[in-house]
Amino acid sequence: MTQPVMKQAGQFTIAGISGDGGQTAKVWARFEEMYGAKPFAKAYADACEVRFYSNEEQGKDIFVGYALAEGADVGGFETLVLPAVPYAVFDVLVTQGYDSGNATMDKWLDDNAHIYGALEMDGKGFIVECYTERFKDGDKPDSVVEMWVPLYRVCQSCSMPMTKAADFGKNADGTPSADYCCYCHSNGAFGNPDETLEEMIESCIPFCWEQYVDDDAARADMRARFPKLKRWAK
């Protein structure tokens, strides 16, 4: 598996059905039967499978279907809205197994944790499997499935997760900052331009007490992570 391709996707809706991830083939067969009987307009031809993790709803840890065309009648299908966020897209050779890329994806997320985090939906981790024209029924040596890992950006000043549009700061021209949160950056400038790294760490500690056993643990972790952030990188 190579390094991922970064893609920024707009919000889109998948129409389909949910089911048991342990019975994937049966879920797909049921969806295809339903779609054959009552098709809906697709936004594009690729099929999608969304897998959820840490899911307490038994039997509803996958969602399969197609992207719904804008304004199309969904009929009797369920819908799942995927957010407009960046995705890290990994290619996985089907013959090596769908889980064969997990270690590479985990390592990439760990190596880039100062820039990105894995986005959750309603408290659950998820990944989108896309079946494009490169997926050749899974029985060819070069058959590929794309694994789309949804991401949020990390503020490059205070490391706050920026998971929604309101979290981002503003550039001087009013456009959203790609790097800094609304608390650190406004109108193209830092709110406290003379702030030191240590001062930033101390100001962040009261907001993350749930993540650490005590202030010293928080301080030690931030001292290890913050120098990698864009504002503080040497």
Language-model features: locations:
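Short cysteine-rich clusters marking metal-coordination/redox-active sites
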Residues: 155-158, 181
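Cys/His-coordinated zinc-binding microdomains
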Residues: 159-160, 184-188
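Short, non-ligating residues that shape and space the ligands of small metal-coordination modules
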Residues: 164-165, 190-193
